[in-house]
From Swiss-Prot:
PANTHER family, sorted: TRANSCRIPTIONAL REPRESSOR NRDR
Cofactor comment: Binds 1 zinc ion.
Pfam families documented for this protein: ATP-cone, Zn_ribbon_NrdR
Protein's name in the database: Transcriptional repressor NrdR
Organism from which the protein derives: Fusobacterium nucleatum subsp. nucleatum (strain ATCC 25586 / DSM 15643 / BCRC 10681 / CIP 101130 / JCM 8532 / KCTC 2640 / LMG 13131 / VPI 4355)
Function according to Swiss-Prot or TrEMBL: Negatively regulates transcription of bacterial ribonucleotide reductase nrd genes and operons by binding to NrdR-boxes.
Family: Belongs to the NrdR family.
Domain ATP-cone as annotated: residue spans: 48-138
Cofactor: Zn(2+)
Sections of the chain in a coiled coil: none
Keywords recorded for this protein, A-Z: ATP-binding, DNA-binding, Metal-binding, Nucleotide-binding, Repressor, Transcription, Transcription regulation, Zinc, Zinc-finger
Amino acid sequence: MKCPFCSSEDTKVVDSRTTIDGSTKRRRECNNCLKRFSTYERFEESPIYVVKKDNRRVKYDREKLLRGLTFATAKRNVSREELDKIITDIERSLQNSLISEISSKDLGEKVLEKLRELDQVAYVRFASVYKEFDDIKSFIEIVEEIKKD
């Protein structure tokens, strides 16, 4: 690893840690100038595409999913770390399955499954947008479904 300060390639790893998203943070020290710096290593993942209802294919966007989850959990006792964990779990599951595409329907179902375990109000909020509720009956049905559990 090349030192960002003096460009020497003579560096050593002082400390390594796995971060919440699965990447590895390494603290390094240059043997030439003795300065320290951090590097992050992450597996290169194959891109995943989301197939929309109209059959368009768009590249999976972690930030878009985070925005949807943030909206669904607004004013709920759900931390950013919990949302990151949901997203990371879904991403790992997709990478492990070795698929290159997922339908927006299947992705939405995976999110709903995670939200149902985490917060029932957020689950109903997300479902109302994802399933395009257009009347109060849809809300009543989903609440009744939750009450059965």
